[in-house]
């Protein structure tokens, strides 16, 4: 739902995997189904006649689409090798194979740059199921391995067509780039740390700056899970950008405590073009912050907002709406949000496979429809009747939308909209007109009534502490040593 409205990001991870596959000597094509249609895919399949097709499954809500496309690909190209990878796919590999009913040859868990060329080399070999991170109907290999050097396999951006379609908010058009990978924190609702094993790796300042310099777009989303944890790294990249005279507008995401600790660095990047920042507040009260294991206080969150205002950054924040909220809780969030200048988003608490709360949440799922696992739908029991919950959720989002996108916001956001239009970019302007049709309480409620073809396996009974072997994709180094 959010990708229908607020953003459409280039498939950076897939571009990096494509670069690795191309470096291994293969002819590669990339088709982004955020932009292209299923008919476009069918034409590409018929014209290119690939020996292998890989689907990147980063979002759980796309599982039914990927399964159906894999089955159709098998019918149209019986000899084609079909694999699935990506963030969400890594956590549900066995059930993807089960849903695929023979259409999927393997699921690749973990990072794809190193292992995908090896999979293609071994695709008709009995050794396929022995490769790290590979899961087949015949078995699975050892745990996946991490990419040892982020400077390898820079994105094959030339393979992504219609790049003018990529944007985030007022940054239209917008490319994506990666300076670091991973997150050392352990928030209970997040799967970044469980995927990467709490590792944190950095690209070299020289290569990071060279990559940014190669980007044609005027705007760049820095996709790091937590930007600028290590200030010396951020300063070094900035100095390289200055030396190369690279000037862009940047969007990034970070934590409030990182902003407080490294405020001089963020002020420096403001001079380099940092325009837009996302801060995951997640909650306004200490009890909820502890529940989410944010390891931060409300006071620190509010201090970070003050710092961002002083620097002069446009800031978006997120609040997690728990399914147990009542009308008064929504009202309190609306009241607070109208007193601050920041853009405030609400997402619905969702226990995804791969998050710790998938294992620890005692409330039973009310739906196992993959399409509803998008942080816009309630998949846990709601305190209010479900239709009333959506009414309050959409009412809150509508009020906040008018705050940031209504007439009062024209002085701040009107110029970016005009500038985008003068470039022939219409993504942001179209976003302004689509809110009511996308964020709609009746649509969200009706989504629960759709027939379900593919259901995820239910979680096991809740436990206090998950087994690390089940929780992590890439096992943390300290746990590997203990094994």
Predicted feature locations:
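Short, electropositive alpha-helical surface patch
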Residues: 237-241, 327-343, 404
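Glycine-rich beta-alpha loop elements in corrinoid/cobalamin-binding modules
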Residues: 13, 17-147, 348-350, 354
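Flexible glycine/acidic-rich beta-alpha junction loops that bind and position SAM and/or redox cofactors
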Residues: 4, 92, 185, 232, ...
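Radical SAM [4Fe-4S] cluster-binding motif and immediate context
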Residues: 9, 157-319, 323, 335
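Glycine- and acidic-residue-enriched helix-capping/strand-helix junction motifs
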Residues: 2-14
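Short acidic active-site motifs
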Residues: 39-41, 92, 261-265, 329
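Radical SAM enzyme core and accessory elements
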Residues: 42-45, 51, 103, 139, ...
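Structural recognition of alpha->loop->beta junctions
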Residues: 95-114, 268-277, 333-347
